[in-house]
Amino acid sequence: MKTLLLSLVVVTFVCLDLAHTRTCYSCTENICLQHEQCQDGQDVCYKRWNTTYLILTDVVRGCAKTCPTPIEEEEVYCCLKDNCN
């Protein structure tokens, strides 16, 4: 009986951990307080911005399956924890 109970606890823990959905900041402003629950398979939080000017411009934050590739004069920061972007 104890073995069955322990097995159920382990299975429940594993299933709950696999069902975790990443949460990332999602906005287009420098200061961001808006969160987004990422879709299944989107485990990367990212922040991309234009480096043409001295100040951060064209900042975009959100969820992705993989880290976005920066385009010309753009930088991208990616991370794998909730709201790390």
Curated annotation (Swiss-Prot):
Chief localization: secreted
MF (Gene Ontology): toxin activity
Pfam family name, one: Toxin_cobra-type
Coiled-coil regions, chain positions: none
The organism's place on the tree of life at top rank: Eukaryota
Tissue distribution of the protein: Expressed by the venom gland.
Residue pairs linked by disulfide bridges in the UniProt entry: 24-45, 27-32, 38-63, 67-78, 79-84
Subcellular location: Secreted
CDD domains in the cross-refs: TFP_snake_toxin
Keywords, in A-Z order: Disulfide bond, Secreted, Signal, Toxin
One term under GO cellular component: extracellular region
Position of the signal peptide: 1-21
Family: Belongs to the three-finger toxin family. Ancestral subfamily.
Protein's name according to its UniProt entry: Toxin 3FTx-Lei1
Organism expressing this protein natively: Leioheterodon madagascariensis (Malagasy giant hognose snake)
Source taxonomy: Eukaryota, Metazoa, Chordata, Craniata, Vertebrata
